[in-house]
């Protein structure tokens, strides 16, 4: 299977060269294809899968997709990548257009993700505190500010009685952007 995957990678690099320099690396037991460190496609078991996006939805409706899946802890996980069938390989213009849609959507998502402010980026916040806030429904800075430190602390306290007043002060400092 590995040699089939490499053949498909090289064929993809050749067909999609107009998108830029396509690099590959191992990921989830498959290979990710990237342009400028942005993943837009995967190769698994000798098949190319493109990242599904809004622009490719019409194609996916007309051609019911086979989704990329992999095993994680004994469970099947379906990724948002659809298989490129032989008819699409025969229509290189359409393949390049759909690949460009996938790449553009991935680049757009990457830029919005990089501009979005995470809770852990605030003063006094750690990855652990961000995680437990997420467990009580507070997933971003906006929600933290709207609810306020006291309400967030009460939600945390309701779920875990070991949450101390120190966390309340940390939340206050994070909202006010001051270290405690």
Question: Where in the sequence are the language-model features?
Answer:
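A generic alpha-helix structural signal
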Residues: 13-16, 99, 153
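C-terminal extensions
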Residues: 1-3, 25, 31, 108-180
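Long, highly charged amphipathic alpha-helices
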Residues: 7, 11, 97-101, 170
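Short, structured interface segments
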Residues: 91-114
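Short flexible/disordered coil segments
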Residues: 82-99, 137-139, 172-179
């Amino acid at each position: 299977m590995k040699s089939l995957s490499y053949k498909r990678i090289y064929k993809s690099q050749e067909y999609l060269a107009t998108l830029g320099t396509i690099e590959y690396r191992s990921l989830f037991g498959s290979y990710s294809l990237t342009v400028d460190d942005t993943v837009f496609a995967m190769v698994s078991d000798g098949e190319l899968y493109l990242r599904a996006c809004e622009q490719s939805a019409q194609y996916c409706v007309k051609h019911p997709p086979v989704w990329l899946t992999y095993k994680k802890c004994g469970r099947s996980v379906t990724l948002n990548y659809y298989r490129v069938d032989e008819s699409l390989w025969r229509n290189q213009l359409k393949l390049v257009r759909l690949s460009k849609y996938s790449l553009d959507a991935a680049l757009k998502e990457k830029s919005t993700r990089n501009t979005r402010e995470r809770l852990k980026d605030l003063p006094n916040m750690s990855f652990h505190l961000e995680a437990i806030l997420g467990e009580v429904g507070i997933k971003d800075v906006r929600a933290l500010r709207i609810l306020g430190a006291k309400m967030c602390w009460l939600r945390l306290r309701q779920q875990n009685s070991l949450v101390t007043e120190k966390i309340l002060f940390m939340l206050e400092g994070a909202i006010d952007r001051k270290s405690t």
